Amino acid sequence: CNSNYTSKKEGYFKIDFPKKVYTTFNDPTFPYSFEYPVYARISKDSSYFNDGSRNPFSINIVFPSFNGTIFISYKNVGGTSVYNVKNPDGSYRDSTGKNSFEKMVNDSYNLTYKNDIKAYSIEDSVMHTPFNITGVFFKLSGNVATAKQFFLSDTLYHFLRGALYFDATPNEDSLRPVNAFLQEDMKHLINTLKWK
């Protein structure tokens, strides 16, 4: 009771990152391929509809040791998709819409900027890959749900969007090292993406 009080600084655990080694995702039924790290696993994404047939080319790249996932969604430019539309009573109904390139780009920006309440900055940078694919990479700063997002397209046939999420309460300081580490993997995925 008579000892001097010593304040304890807030700290975070040291994270030992694995060596960067990549393997190829090249499912013959998919319209794209890319390289991803061996410390991740691929799973089919049915989280939005509980029915993978509505979006059969959407996948998750899961990083179990980091409690993170890159959600990848794919759509055909000019094709149609089923969207959930909110009714006035709060329930949802299915609606079919055309996948125009402009609409998908606007949707990507809108999804990114939904984080502007928590973000204190949002940076976007235009990308051009070695395989003549263009897109935009978003870096968000602040306690946001997803600090890294991107979309890629050839503007005529293919459109792919990715967003990194963690199964944790957003805390920019504690997630910074893992966000930086997985950003390298996202950039590798982007630079190795090929359309089929």
Predicted regions and their residues:
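Short, well-structured beta-strand
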Residues: Y5-K8, E102, Y109-K196
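Short beta-strand-initiation
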Residues: K20, T29, P56, A145-A147
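Short, ordered beta-strand-loop transition motifs
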Residues: N26, D45-N55, V126-T134
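Bacterial Sec signal peptide processing site at the extreme N-terminus
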Residues: C1-F17
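Short aromatic-glycine motifs in intrinsically disordered, low-complexity regions
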Residues: V21-S33, V178
